[in-house]
Amino acid sequence: MGYLFTSESVSEGHPDKVADQISDAVLDKLLAFDPSSKVACETLVTTGQVVLAGEVKTKAYVDLQRIAREVINRIGYTKSEYMFEGNSCGVFSAIHEQSADINRGVEREDPMNQGAGDQGMMFGYATNETENYMPLSLDLAHKLLMVLAEIRREGKVMTYLRPDAKSQVTIEYDDNGKPVRIDTIVVSTQHDEFVTPADSSKEAQLKADEEMLAKIRQDVIEILMPRVIAGIHNEEVLALFNDRIVYHVNPTGKFVIGGPHGDTGLTGRKIIVDTYGGKGAHGGGAFSGKDPSKVDRSAAYAARHIAKNMVAAGVADEMLVQVSYAIGVARPINIYVNTYGRSNVKLSDGEIAKKIDELFDLRPKAIEERLKLRNPIYEETASYGHMGREPKVVTKTYESMYHEAKTLEVELFTWEKLDYVDKIKEAFGL
């Protein structure tokens, strides 16, 4: 019997994602001026306020207020009626120095033997049901909101859009785990109050709300969806769109109050959106605001890199990779593989795990170097998912009143590169 599977995404203007982006913007600026920075930056955003807290060890000085305001303005919180606006919100910092005990436990004379920054288990997942080796439900949920943000920034249609939004996509699968069709799409988007009631009566207000909701629903189906579909070039995925899709658009009705004014946002509260949308597994550690000595982040990226390259090489159609660490110890405690019975090689999952251990150095410093993680590459990861993104080289310029400006060429989403496929094929005789 087939089944339904659902994943959700949230926009860059969702309060938790605002917090993630501020935390990663702080991390990026510190890494730009001091690549050896140790950073754990947490952010809280609420009505008219930003609170930064955490632990940092660095030689760099950065303007935290300016960083936070630039991120908020870039996202689109630029109007006072949002009750959270980049130029006027308060920014409070309680960031202090990293624990000397943790630092002693992690650093080593030989950098390659640098210990893990904490204990824990991290997971990487990949499936061949999409071209970027991501679960289809999450991939589509991200695409919906990325296109919605493009429409908002263009300002030509759907001009009532505000930054906060969520999406959810449900896919029907057959008995063999293959996508059959898209079952349900949910889009909730914050908006201006763009229909004025005829008078102050409750009935007039209700009628105005119904007009707004009808317009938003129409625009999602007639403007947003065609643009999303036009950006999909995989014929198998395009065939899943059908006239039976159930659309829920702003199902609670009016959504004017939103963003950090509607809900307080915190760093690290969207870890399933950040990863695989509920497929695979998650070790529980968030990513944003953490430098790569924190294996919560770096080892999760490494595990994704492994899983994606293994699936792309044809070892399996689907793969989950787990690694775990003890704080202060460089080598992982274990490597675990689950191919869900979809392996294409005559090896057990345990034997596949042993080959992974031979192919990939999973010491934290080796991961940092292989994936070029000591660079300011993180703000881009903090919205629309850390996984399944397109690797690319960009040039960034960082200015500071405390340091000379720095222009750096950096590579984004290195863990998404298919640079180990040939080595894996050779190792597995494929």
From Swiss-Prot:
Keywords in alphabetical order: ATP-binding, Cytoplasm, Magnesium, Metal-binding, Nucleotide-binding, One-carbon metabolism, Potassium, Transferase
Biological processes per GO annotation: one-carbon metabolic process; S-adenosylmethionine biosynthetic process
Primary localization: cytoplasm
Catalyzed reactions: L-methionine + ATP + H2O = S-adenosyl-L-methionine + phosphate + diphosphate
Enzyme Commission designation: 2.5.1.6
Residues covered by region (Flexible loop): 98-108
Pathway assignment: Amino-acid biosynthesis; S-adenosyl-L-methionine biosynthesis; S-adenosyl-L-methionine from L-methionine: step 1/1
Record flagged with keyword Transcription: no
Any one of the GO CC terms: cytoplasm
GO MF terms, alphabetically ordered: ATP binding; magnesium ion binding; methionine adenosyltransferase activity
Annotated residues for binding of ATP: 14, 164-166, 254-255, 263, 269-270, 286, 290
Record-listed Mg(2+) binding positions: 16
Cofactor comment: Binds 2 divalent ions per subunit. Binds 1 potassium ion per subunit.
HAMAP family found in the cross-reference section: S_AdoMet_synth1
Subunit structure: Homotetramer; dimer of dimers.
Function: Catalyzes the formation of S-adenosylmethionine (AdoMet) from methionine and ATP. The overall synthetic reaction is composed of two sequential steps, AdoMet formation and the subsequent tripolyphosphate hydrolysis which occurs prior to release of AdoMet from the enzyme.
Name the UniProt record assigns to this protein: S-adenosylmethionine synthase
Organism this protein belongs to: Phocaeicola vulgatus (strain ATCC 8482 / DSM 1447 / JCM 5826 / CCUG 4940 / NBRC 14291 / NCTC 11154) (Bacteroides vulgatus)
Classification of source organism: Bacteria, Pseudomonadati, Bacteroidota, Bacteroidia, Bacteroidales
